[in-house]
Curated annotation (Swiss-Prot):
<dbReference type="GO" id="GO:0042274">
    <property type="term" value="P:ribosomal small subunit biogenesis"/>
</dbReference>
<dbReference type="InterPro" id="IPR011961">
    <property type="entry name" value="RimM"/>
</dbReference>
<keyword id="KW-0698">rRNA processing</keyword>
<keyword id="KW-0963">Cytoplasm</keyword>
<keyword id="KW-0690">Ribosome biogenesis</keyword>
<dbReference type="GO" id="GO:0005737">
    <property type="term" value="C:cytoplasm"/>
</dbReference>
<dbReference type="InterPro" id="IPR036976">
    <property type="entry name" value="RimM_N_sf"/>
</dbReference>
<comment type="function">
    <text>An accessory protein needed during the final step in the assembly of 30S ribosomal subunit, possibly for assembly of the head region. Essential for efficient processing of 16S rRNA. May be needed both before and after RbfA during the maturation of 16S rRNA. It has affinity for free ribosomal 30S subunits but not for 70S ribosomes.</text>
</comment>
<dbReference type="GO" id="GO:0005840">
    <property type="term" value="C:ribosome"/>
</dbReference>
<dbReference type="Pfam" id="PF05239">
    <property type="entry name" value="PRC"/>
</dbReference>
<protein>
    <recommendedName>
        <fullName>Ribosome maturation factor RimM</fullName>
    </recommendedName>
</protein>
<dbReference type="InterPro" id="IPR009000">
    <property type="entry name" value="Transl_B-barrel_sf"/>
</dbReference>
<dbReference type="InterPro" id="IPR002676">
    <property type="entry name" value="RimM_N"/>
</dbReference>
<dbReference type="GO" id="GO:0006364">
    <property type="term" value="P:rRNA processing"/>
</dbReference>
<comment type="subunit">
    <text>Binds ribosomal protein uS19.</text>
</comment>
<dbReference type="InterPro" id="IPR011033">
    <property type="entry name" value="PRC_barrel-like_sf"/>
</dbReference>
<comment type="similarity">
    <text>Belongs to the RimM family.</text>
</comment>
């Protein structure tokens, strides 16, 4: 079965079995809602077990979650550093114009039909996502996912068309 990363357990939260998760999910509210099924993978990326979310809340930059049948810190402490993943079957349907992060990673980025590089990572620093584009012979480009910059995302052809605003590329 194919799985996709949605978060990393970075610490425990209190004594009642809550965990602090650093989300890398494109739809965190949906992904961590009560009843969601996720898979737990250890630090060597080996499947450990399926888990069910029983509670979720946001706190600063973290998602605080609790799993079914794990109601004490002693039951969850061993999972620090583990990765949470969603199976392909549990991803859910997308609306037109929406896509999953894993579909964007690796896409070729073009400006006026000139290849700039490939998306290697997606950050969620605040109001909008930032795509990190790996370029040949240059530093990585931080590309804000906003309409004036990202013009078209063609998932089937793995292509992104952009128009770099002045000041975005500090190496030009």
């Amino acid at each position: 079965m194919e799985y996709f990363n949605v978060g990393k357990i970075v610490n425990t939260q209190g004594l009642q079995g809550e965990m602090r998760v650093l989300s890398v999910s494109d739809f965190a509210e949906e992904r961590f809602k009560k009843g969601s099924q996720l898979a737990l993978f250890d630090d060597k990326d080996r499947f450990v077990q399926e888990v069910t979310i029983v509670s979720h809340r946001k706190q600063k930059h973290f998602d605080i979650i609790k799993f079914k049948d794990m109601y004490h810190i002693n039951a969850i402490e061993k999972y620090k550093g583990y990765t949470l993943k969603v199976s392909k079957d549990n991803q859910g349907d997308l609306q037109e114009g929406e896509f999953y992060y894993h579909q964007i990673i690796g896409m070729a980025v073009y400006e006026k039909d000139v290849l700039i590089g490939h998306v290697k990572e997606i950050l969620q620093p605040g109001a909008n996502d930032v795509w990190i584009v790996k370029r040949q012979g240059k530093r990585d480009l931080l590309l804000p996912y906003i309409p004036p910059v990202v013009l078209n995302v063609d998932v089937p052809n793995k292509r992104v068309d952009v128009e770099l605003m002045e000041g975005l590329d500090d190496e030009d």
